[in-house]
């Protein structure tokens, strides 16, 4: 999807806020702990290359989801440590090794398949994934971990790290978290060979369970200034949302009582009303279930009336504003703010999804001033 620069809908990313957020977390974890910045999914919609370049000196490496995301960073000239968190196909190993990209190995079946296909692992950098209770990828016992590490080393791979992922670190109850932590720490203590880097802390763990940080953290959503729990848990320190989503009024008209607006004629004006049209829609990630939500115009909340279309929304205005007047979908206008978490609550989802769904059609612009 091509970025649409010739319309007013834009995502502005404040790189200085991302740097600030990283510093906030780093101040509250052990100084010896490495920081891996998670820039998968285009840095949660913020722009992977631009974010990585801005924070390169602040972190110890980057985490991505797949080989293509890792190659994007390499092709942009970023030669830092990169860990692919997902599982690679065996035929992708050679390219990862060539580009000095660390891969995740998550079970013996994958290793056996690689061996059967005679894929050369010599010189490959590996982190082993442990499934401590998430139920996705990873080894589930000390015996399996020991066998996998020994096999990888015999094949010439370098096992530099081992890690797990917590399912409920962003929840008030710590029962499941404690079970996972105990499983992982017990497994680590029983390894025949302990890799140098041991990491389990995602954003939520780094914030609310900082005393359990091992020797590295993986910072994702908090780096972009959002609460991993939504609003379920209070943040112990300030972080600043890094992304603003704005557009502008392209038409303003008066409709009369009884007039309908949008597909399906789902909205009927109860009296004479001023309706503004904004060029943003579900193709941009502003989804159809946001009908009835609001945006900000000149510091005023304005309801989205009628269905969200592919390319446009219609909003009820308190008065007839000039064409080109700024419309804030995510961000601050005057004394009022709409956060990605607010949008998520309306959609009954999580703030991660709201950011990741902002499509490539929305140009990203960058405020590069650093405070």
UniProtKB/Swiss-Prot annotation:
Cofactor(s), by name: pyridoxal 5'-phosphate
Keywords linked to the UniProt accession: Isomerase, Pyridoxal phosphate
Pathway linked to the protein: Amino-acid biosynthesis; D-alanine biosynthesis; D-alanine from L-alanine: step 1/1
Record's catalysed reaction(s): L-alanine = D-alanine
EC number, UniProt record: 5.1.1.1
A GO CC annotation given for this chain: cytosol
An example Gene Ontology molecular-function term: pyridoxal phosphate binding
Active site: 40 (proton acceptor), 263 (proton acceptor)
Top-rank lineage group of the source organism: Bacteria
Modified residues (N6-(pyridoxal phosphate)lysine): 40
CDD domains to which the protein is assigned, alphabetical: PLPDE_III_AR (cd00430)
Gene3D superfamilies: Alanine racemase, Lyase, Ornithine Decarboxylase, Chain A, domain 1
Group of enzyme by EC: isomerase
Residues that hold substrate according to the record: 136, 310
SUPFAM superfamilies per record: Alanine racemase C-terminal domain-like, PLP-binding barrel
Family annotation (PANTHER family): ALANINE RACEMASE (PTHR30511), ALANINE RACEMASE, CATABOLIC-RELATED (PTHR30511:SF0)
Function as written in the Swiss-Prot or TrEMBL entry: Catalyzes the interconversion of L-alanine and D-alanine. May also act on other amino acids.
Name of this protein: Alanine racemase
